[in-house]
Amino acid sequence: MFLTVKLLLGRRCSLKVSGKESVATLKKLVSQHLQVPEEQQHLLFRGQLLADDKYLSDYSIGPNASINVIMRPPEDAALDKTHQTQPLWLQLGQVLDKHFGAKDAKTVLGFLRQEHEERLQRLSLEALEQLVGQLLAQQQLDELAEEKEAPAVASELEQNNGGGGGGGGTGGEGGGKKEEEEGEEADQ
């Protein structure tokens, strides 16, 4: 059977395989034809991630099926990103240097570190659990607000791009502000 394998960036190839082939074997073929290293490939069929140790027949992949390839960054690139961020105390020291003399900035930073350590020692497990609960609740509210905001922005773009007729465009802006205000009220 023939499978069409597509990269998100538009490259594609057609591969002849049997249903008895493993996903790992398919990854090798994809690597040869599309020059995507096997360890960077995620293969998807109908939105389902294919496991390397399974066979194509396990996913009921038939002739003329289409497999999507998503490239994940190499693991060493992910490690580089984590090392690029500066520690809090270094960043704070740089900010203090801008506003104080070098000696004063070092003294203030020392006091801040000492106070930070003292407060960490006084924190109870209950207080940490409460803080985590609040942060998770805020994160969920932010995600809900983003989900509500995305369709509103899309509909406003449609109106501004000729979908709304000749209303001058001011009505769309007012509606967006009202939705923002409603979202803020819901957050409180």
Curated annotation (Swiss-Prot):
Domain Ubiquitin-like: 1-76
Sequence ranges of Gly residues compositional bias: 161-174
InterPro entries per UniProt: Ubiquitin-like_dom (IPR000626), Ubiquitin-like_domsf (IPR029071), Ubiquitin_dom (IPR019956), Ubl4_C_TUGS (IPR041421), UBL4B (IPR043317)
Protein keywords: Cytoplasm
Pfam families: Tugs, ubiquitin
Region (Disordered): 146-188
Tissue and organ distribution: Expressed specifically in post-meiotic male germ cells of the testis. Abundantly expressed in stage 14-16 spermatids.
Record-level GO cellular component terms: cytoplasm
Compartment list: Cytoplasm
UniProt xrefs under SMART domains: UBQ
Matching PANTHER family: UBIQUITIN-LIKE PROTEIN 4B
General remark: May have arisen from retrotransposition of the X-linked Ubl4a gene during mammalian evolution.
UniProt name for this protein: Ubiquitin-like protein 4B
Originating gene: Ubl4b
